[in-house]
Amino acid sequence: YGEWIERFGVDGFRIDTARHVNPEFWQQFVPAMLARARAAGIPNFHIFGEVNTSKMDPALLAVHTRVDRLPAVLDFAFAAAVRESVAGNAGTEVLATLFEDDALYEGGAAAALQLPTFISNHDNGRFGYFVQQLRPGISDDESLRRVLLGHAMLFTLRGVPVVYYGDEQGFAGAGGDQDARQDMFESQVASYLSERHLGGAIAGGSHFDTRHPLYRAIAGLAQLRSAQAALRRGQQIVRSSGPKPGLFAVSRMDPDNGREILIAFNTSLTAVSAQVLIESASRRFVALHGNCEAESSAPGSYHVAVAPLDFVVCAAVAE
């Protein structure tokens, strides 16, 4: 494995089925690979393990960063929390609980910033599939909006977003494993040809459409994240959550200048309007996505209004 680093300059390892290997092996393997990478001039070599679970259980994941000494693990708990709150009908407090448990990881909340996050994958299934399973009879329009909202969380909340191929083309699938591994090119697989796609995609054609609404939305989210250091590596503070679908709000703090970006999501089918706690130094704002008030309502308080199944991104600016 060290030869892959030295000969080909790979930037990291994704370790499949990491939970099924004795911890003592990872305790030796990880530092050895990091040392080889540093010697090869790759100081930020990233290693993360797959610890597959369908549960919103950060403790199950975190133990592998403490006992196995893996630098990071795929954040299956993030996928479960977004599935429950956006595809399903759970309150937004499940998201707050997810992030409260960041303290469990070796290195705490700072280490959780480098957890690879996702909402779809090749084993468990696609987010569009979960939306349709958890909400029988849902319209195509609402399915698309919920998938868009899930991706908005993926790109703006803490962690390193992992987009599963085909989600940007409206793939939903019919389950996990083979049922979530459709062809991007024109398929001849009968089960794939009969699938329901989101956003107007035709199941029988090829799927490289840069005009697809999900492709455009994900590209826009990637640009937003790329432009804002706070969204890539800033501290995250949960500002608002509740026991029912509705408002979930967080602040992301710019690691270079300390400025705040407030992100508010609405997981319900009715508009939400609320006062949200912010830093007292954050007084003037500009909209990065959606509609944002130009000024705080009072020191430490900011008004947000979010349409159903939508989100806003409001950035504090220097006065």
Feature-to-residue mapping (PLM):
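Active-site-proximal helices and loops of the catalytic beta/alpha 8
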Residues: 1-2, 6-111, 115, 143, ...
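Active-site clefts of carbohydrate-active enzymes
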Residues: 112-140
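Substrate-binding and catalytic surfaces of secreted/luminal carbohydrate-active proteins
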Residues: 124-126, 148, 156-157, 180, ...
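Substrate-binding cleft of secreted/luminal carbohydrate-active enzymes
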Residues: 151-171
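Surface beta-strand/loop "capping" patches
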Residues: 234-257
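Asparagine-centered strand-capping/turn motif at beta-strand->loop junctions
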Residues: 264-268
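Solvent-exposed beta-hairpin/edge-strand motifs
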Residues: 278-292
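C-terminal beta-strand-rich structural cap/linker in extracellular carbohydrate-active enzymes
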Residues: 296-319
